Amino acid sequence: MKTVVFAYHDMGCLGIEALLAAGYEISAIFTHTDNPGEKAFYGSVARLAAERGIPVYAPDNVNHPLWVERIAQLSPEVIFSFYYRHLICDEILQLAPRGAFNLHGSLLPKYRGRAPLNWVLVNGETETGVTLHRMVKRADAGAIVAQLRVAIAPDDIAITLHHKLCHAARQLLEQTLPAIKHGNILEIAQRENEATCFGRRTPDDSFLEWHKSASVLHNMVRAVADPWPGAFSYVGNQKFTVWSSRVHPHASKAQPGSVISVAPLLIACGDGALEIVTGQAGDGITMQGSQLAQTLGLVQGSRLNSQPACAARRRTRVLILGVNGFIGNHLTERLLREDHYEVYGLDIGSDAISRFMNHPHFHFVEGDISIHSEWIEYHVKKCDVVLPLVAIATPIEYTRNPLRVFELDFEENLRIIRYCVKYRKRIIFPSTSEVYGMCSDKYFDEDHSNLIVGPVNKPRWIYSVSKQLLDRVIWAYGEKEGLQFTLFRPFNWMGPRLDNLNAARIGSSRAITQLILNLVEGSPIKLIDGGKQKRCFTDIRDGIEALYRIIENAGNRCDGEIINIGNPENEASIEELGEMLLASFEKHPLRHYFPPFAGFRVVESSSYYGKGYQDVEHRKPSIRNARRCLDWEPKIDMQETIDETLDFFLRTVDLTDKPS
């Protein structure tokens, strides 16, 4: 049976050997070039392929149409993937009439995603395994063909567990590959409600946070022990690595991170104490804990920290343009909740951020981005992270003031992007779910969905294409000039301080604010073209948590990424949104202050938005990038968001002249 194989690492080598032993004909192997910054302790797929006389390739992007065509010419009957590090596009998967199969290092549906070997140890699991599953468009989500369980011993570290998994994988493939060859397999669908997903790990993720329990820190040490980069901490600015450890149930009142003793080297944790058995100072040699203490100059009572002392003193400076807006003010609140951010903001108003004005780490200037260009350039140069959140983002303005939308949303933001390029500053840019336009995909995917808009004589698309072109400009600056960037695409975020009722009175607001105004004034709720259009509504708290994690950028996982931030489970039509809002309104304790409900009224979009409007029937995000890069899932139910948003707006209404 002819096959094409995608493989890397030890699992890739043993997978290839198993295929050959089972009588498969391998037409080509696709692998990766080794990363010079990665310790190569594993077998070389490229070398094995060369020794076996099999053509081998390592393209940067195997999903490029040219490679898809070359693979199609090989006419594979079946495709296998063994620890290949990139997602394989659906066009390639569909080339094999007998299907495509992937070997994954966990007991799916648990631990989908990257580095399951390390994550199970980090999380203190006692069992894992290997799974052979059918490949589908969504990573690690296809039906299970075979699994083998592997026990995790208390003394297992990453390398010993790796060897166990390799042994299990050989057994599993020996048993299963002949059955696949003869079409004699039983597939079991994964239980989505049991699925968990984890993102890529980098060396920077393995710092020891001493406020955590000793058992948690010991698991971190096990998960990244040699030949992985190791768990680490600091004494002042001196970095050291912990290669092995033991948990002590030591009852101590010492502050977490304090040295309890140096022989053995015992460190106080949030719960218990951790003995550092072996470690390494800087780029030195491995030594026992007591010698490490001497090398680092530690004595009883010394304090360790999770980051260099100089870094701990320096707050990250974040520039938010449009800080008084819906996202800006909520993000400011989230950043100031931590003690390592300095927020600089500019906006034309300050009502939503008045609660921060006396905060020592919040600095605000009232101004217009089209006028205060010198102030903006200076602060781009001064700050570490830039978020240009200023935009006209209400649909009625797209047809009413298309040129103003272009001037502000495109031209002014392009200038800020160029400042970031000039001063080599990280930019986190708010793209929009609008860029997907009339895409027909069930889930809008950042990396694969087409961006489809209407004709030029429909000015409603000027916002979408302005944002899309900026996305492409930023991407090009990243590719050609090294701009550090992340694009995020919000999907219908809702919550307190979204617009205001005065904006709704002139039609320049989002949908829920307009509906609340109708209820407050006793006017009919207008359902544009029947209100059947579906959206996925996302609580502002979920959205801001994801955005905060983008700013944190653990392990630089967000660099160069486009990330949808939305809740695909909170899908509802505008009509359903209105009905849910009405039910919440009728139960509200302030309900008696407002007029009777005036009913729903269906209106044509042209009469509401004006000439040149087109609507989108559905807009549902894929959030695989958010899961992978941020370890993020939305949690808040739509009804809770509606209740809190309604309550906020009703309490802003002056009730002094309302009948009680």
From Swiss-Prot:
GO terms for biological process: lipid A biosynthetic process; lipopolysaccharide biosynthetic process; response to antibiotic. (6R)-10-formyltetrahydrofolate binds at H86, L87, I88, R114, V136, K137, R138, A139, D140. NAD(+) binds at D347, D368, I369. Keywords: Antibiotic resistance, Lipid A biosynthesis, Lipid biosynthesis, Lipid metabolism, Lipopolysaccharide biosynthesis, Multifunctional enzyme, NAD, Oxidoreductase, Transferase. InterPro entries: Arna-like_SDR_e (IPR045869), Bifun_polymyxin_resist_ArnA (IPR021168), Epimerase_deHydtase (IPR001509), Formyl_trans_C (IPR005793), Formyl_transf_N (IPR002376), Formyl_transf_N_sf (IPR036477), Formyl_transferase-like_C_sf (IPR011034), Lipid_A_modif_metabolic_enz (IPR050177). The record marks N102 as: Transition state stabilizer. UDP-alpha-D-glucuronate binds at residues 393, 398, 432-433, 460, 492, 526-535, 613. GO terms for molecular function: carboxy-lyase activity; UDP-4-amino-4-deoxy-L-arabinose formyltransferase activity; UDP-glucuronate dehydrogenase activity. Pathway: Nucleotide-sugar biosynthesis; UDP-4-deoxy-4-formamido-beta-L-arabinose biosynthesis; UDP-4-deoxy-4-formamido-beta-L-arabinose from UDP-alpha-D-glucuronate: step 1/3; Nucleotide-sugar biosynthesis; UDP-4-deoxy-4-formamido-beta-L-arabinose biosynthesis; UDP-4-deoxy-4-formamido-beta-L-arabinose from UDP-alpha-D-glucuronate: step 3/3; Bacterial outer membrane biogenesis; lipopolysaccharide biosynthesis. The active site is at H104 (proton donor), E434 (proton acceptor), R619 (proton donor). SUPFAM superfamilies: FMT C-terminal domain-like (SSF50486), Formyltransferase (SSF53328), NAD(P)-binding Rossmann-fold domains (SSF51735). Residues 1-304 are annotated as: Formyltransferase ArnAFT. Pfam families: Epimerase, Formyl_trans_C, Formyl_trans_N. Residues 314-660 are annotated as: Dehydrogenase ArnADH. The record marks D140 as: Raises pKa of active site His. Its EC number is 2.1.2.13, 1.1.1.305. It comes from the Bacteria. The keyword Nucleotide-binding does not apply. One of its GO terms (cellular component) is membrane. It catalyses: UDP-alpha-D-glucuronate + NAD(+) = UDP-beta-L-threo-pentopyranos-4-ulose + CO2 + NADH; UDP-4-amino-4-deoxy-beta-L-arabinose + (6R)-10-formyltetrahydrofolate = UDP-4-deoxy-4-formamido-beta-L-arabinose + (6S)-5,6,7,8-tetrahydrofolate + H(+). Bifunctional enzyme that catalyzes the oxidative decarboxylation of UDP-glucuronic acid (UDP-GlcUA) to UDP-4-keto-arabinose (UDP-Ara4O) and the addition of a formyl group to UDP-4-amino-4-deoxy-L-arabinose (UDP-L-Ara4N) to form UDP-L-4-formamido-arabinose (UDP-L-Ara4FN). The modified arabinose is attached to lipid A and is required for resistance to polymyxin and cationic antimicrobial peptides. NCBIfam families: PRK06988.1 (NF005414), PRK08125.1 (NF005998), PRK11908.1 (NF008872). Homohexamer, formed by a dimer of trimers. In the N-terminal section; belongs to the Fmt family. UDP-L-Ara4N formyltransferase subfamily. This is Bifunctional polymyxin resistance protein ArnA.
